[in-house]
A protein has these predicted regions:
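Helix-to-loop junction immediately C-terminal to a conserved catalytic motif
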Residues: 51
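The feature captures the beta-strand-to-loop junction immediately N-terminal to the Walker
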Residues: 36-38
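Conserved coupling/switch loops of ABC nucleotide-binding domains, chiefly the family-specific signature
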Residues: 57-60, 110, 210, 357
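Conserved ABC transporter NBD signature motif
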Residues: 59-67
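Short coil-to-beta microelement around the adenine-binding A-loop and adjacent beta1/P-loop entry
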Residues: 16-18
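Glycine/charge-rich catalytic "coupling/switch" loops of P-loop NTPases
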Residues: 253-311, 331, 341-370
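ABC ATPase nucleotide-binding domains
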Residues: 73-230, 234
Length: 370
């Protein structure tokens, strides 16, 4: 396997559109890197530049110690898995998996060994004689991965490989891909717009927007310590709630005023806000759905007075309940205990866990404190 280095990578099309802008990333050997972001953010374009399917307009791409900018795709020692499987319909599973090795004139006994080992890893041993039309979507995707595995490449590139599968199969295939990474110790770069895939699969995640890298970090850090408003809103489902808040001083302490509600700000966050010159200014307060509580015990322990609203929508998802209600004219989502007594149309009393709150600069959208 191999490390990768992307230094000041740019992609500009002939019409002047900049798809990727000054992309910098060092990928260690055996890492599982996720490129995530909304459609059109440049993640697939970056992957295709690594593969050699798109020309690099500027910057340097290295795999190991070798500069790859002008190396043909077939000579880069990478394998790519696409979302549409790209299987040959007239070939069996065995022949689809063996095809790339046959083109390279690998000896038959080595091909057979590689195919059967990949089939064992992917639980395809009983399907080797079938043709793609006789396979389910999940089985076809496993064959596409098997075709990549038999080549034993330095780097695996995966471009939204699960997007054509239903929800249940996506969960199963996420587990399969994690197992493959553990078994092979492979370097994997994986593109998705699904932040659940990103959070569950990646050792590190690259969040992109409009061709620009917003933040690179572990899933846990991206969730708990987002670097800006976009990352905070993109990572997490349901997304973080955002409310305008005026930072004020009261009795020697800082509070966040959200409409008529006064929320006590914990000391460390208060210091960051004061040091940043935000007293008297409007900032964006971020609070995740799971950090809004309607339990009487939490409300009584909260240093701030309870907030009130009316439940607009109640959603039961088995192990959890989502409540939707307004705070100062903005819709807020709370993830609460399923034993809650609140229902649609009911008045609700609740409190924010301000220890878990986030504050963002309203102009720059950068994080002030997490």
């Amino acid at each position: 396997m191999a490390s990768l280095s992307l230094q000041h990578i740019n992609k500009t099309y002939p019409n002047g559109f900049e798809a990727v802008k000054d992309f910098n990333l060092e990928i260690e050997d055996k890492e599982f890197i996720i490129f995530v972001g909304p459609s059109g953010c440049g993640k697939s374009t970056t992957l295709r530049m690594i593969a050699g399917l798109e020309e690099i307009s500027g910057g340097t791409l290295k795999i190991g110690d070798k500069v790859m900018n002008d190396v043909e795709p077939k000579d880069r020692d990478i394998a790519m898995v696409f979302q549409n499987y790209a299987l040959y319909p007239h070939m069996t599973v065995y022949d689809n998996m063996a095809f790339g090795l046959k083109l390279r004139k690998v000896p038959k006994d080595q091909i057979d060994k590689a195919v059967r080992e990949a089939a064992r890893i992917l639980d395809l041993e009983k399907l080797l004689d079938r043709k793609p039309k006789a396979l389910s979507g999940g089985q076809r995707q496993r064959v596409a991965m098997g075709r990549a595995i038999v080549r034993n490449p330095k780097v695996f590139l995966m471009d939204e490989p699960l997007s054509n599968l239903d929800a249940k199969l996506r969960v199963q295939m996420r587990i399969e891909i994690s197992k493959i990474h553990q078994r092979l110790g492979a370097t994997i770069i994986y593109v998705t717009h699904d932040q659940t895939e990103a959070m569950t699969l990646g050792t590190r995640i690259v969040v992109m927007k409009d061709g620009v890298v917003q933040q690179v970090d572990t899933p846990q850090n991206l969730y708990q310590k987002p670097g800006n408003l976009f990352v905070a809103g993109f990572m997490g489902s349901p997304q973080m709630n955002f409310l305008d808040a005026v930072i004020s001083e009261k009795g020697g302490n800082l509070i966040a005023k959200v409409g008529d509600h006064e929320l006590a700000i914990p000391a460390a966050k208060a210091k960051a806000l004061k040091d940043g010159g935000y007293v008297g200014k409007t900032v964006v307060l971020g609070i995740r759905p799971e950090d809004i509580h309607d339990s009487q015990m939490f409300i009584e322990a909260s240093p701030s007075a309870p907030m009130t609203s009316v439940v607009k929508v109640y959603e039961l998802l088995g192990a959890e309940v989502f409540l939707y209600f307004d705070v100062n004219g903005t819709q807020v989502t709370a993830r609460v205990d399923p034993r809650t007594t609140a229902k649609t149309g009911d008045p609700i009393k609740f409190a924010f866990d301000m220890e878990k709150s986030h504050f963002f600069d309203k102009e720059t959208e950068l994080t002030i404190c997490n």
